[in-house]
């Protein structure tokens, strides 16, 4: 088991023992993309708050992209992470 992937999954409340190496890599990649998009959204939001950017909705777009990564984990693997997404809750009966 790749410890880097296992640690990444554990950080998000996901049990790595449920997944093979390939699945863990895919899940970890998705979480990395989430982190990148979330960081960009947060950075842009700070620029808005500081008056350095005008509000064109770009930060909401970036946050939506980040949220979509987490939702895709649920859709593709049935994974519910410890991340809360405003306006979305996983439906237990889908999986």
Q: What are these language model-derived features?
A:
Residues 1-2, 67:
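Generic non-transmembrane alpha-helix signal with a bias for helix starts/N-cap capping motifs
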Residues 15-92:
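Acidic, low-complexity, intrinsically disordered interaction modules
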Residues 3-20:
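Short terminal alpha-helical segments
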